[in-house]
């Protein structure tokens, strides 16, 4: 998230949106979707479309600080749009768009940078953390929080969902908004962070946090044979088949609990504690439940892929709505600072 479908509905829909709070979520255009980032980020983000006017920004400008392969970036942008739409983002209820389809945001970032105190941004946790991980120190990386502030302010965002590690970005955004308001008059509303509740870490097949970089992921839209192979390779202990097993320490049980009903979870827990069932059988049960749970999303994804213009149409409609909002805000900004 900014971590972070489609405005331009009916006339009634647009009037209705005016009275709703605006929620902005930023989405990093990263790689293949797996179970960990679905439950950790995607599902809670999509749920926001029922709470207000939800905007979902695919942060391709931000991605340029780390991605140097243009073909990979283009593919990732389309993939993340496809996956969000397949997993339930509704373009009749929310607005999905590419960052770069609203170029005014870079103009606002420059204007904000002219009042941004150097000391404030030198203390940015994310900048220090990325340098510590070996990311090259570039001006773009240093200015990342200014662009993020522009992302938030240009849409008159009321709420920005973030993890605890990104709360500082919202505080910096508010600081810049206050600075601009004190200098040039009331231009910006002050966005409020919504600190996302800590989601339980989704374990990978080796028991560590599921991550593509660890090679322990189970992909949602992968091949059935490969998905089964991944599930069947989940690391387990050496407890004999007949002996009771501890569900609390089982990757199998933790993953099953994400997709099964309360009754199904209770039944598996009982079988773990009773003994008499081997891990292999539990893995088979887990695979079947995972495959069943994501089946509607796989079908929806195939439908979208069958319509070659659908993603482009959705992103174009989203860009139109996002630009309508951004144009109104930038008109205020330019007049306030003397550019018009």
Model-derived features: where do they sit?
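Intrinsic disorder/low-complexity segments
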Residues: 1-20
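N-terminal Rossmann-like or analogous alpha/beta NTP/dinucleotide-binding catalytic cores
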Residues: 22-150, 302
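Short helix-capping/linker segments at secondary-structure and domain boundaries
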Residues: 53, 118-122, 154-161, 260-268, ...
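Short, polar/flexible loop-turn hinges at active-site or ligand-entry regions and domain interfaces
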Residues: 69-70, 160-163, 242
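A generic secondary-structure signal for well-formed alpha-helical elements
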Residues: 81, 88, 116-119, 157, ...
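Short catalytic-loop micro-motif centered on adjacent basic/acidic residues
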Residues: 95-98, 161, 239
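Internal, conserved structured core segments that host functional sites
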Residues: 131-180, 184
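Conserved nucleotide- and phosphate/pyrophosphate-binding catalytic cores
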Residues: 168, 174-340
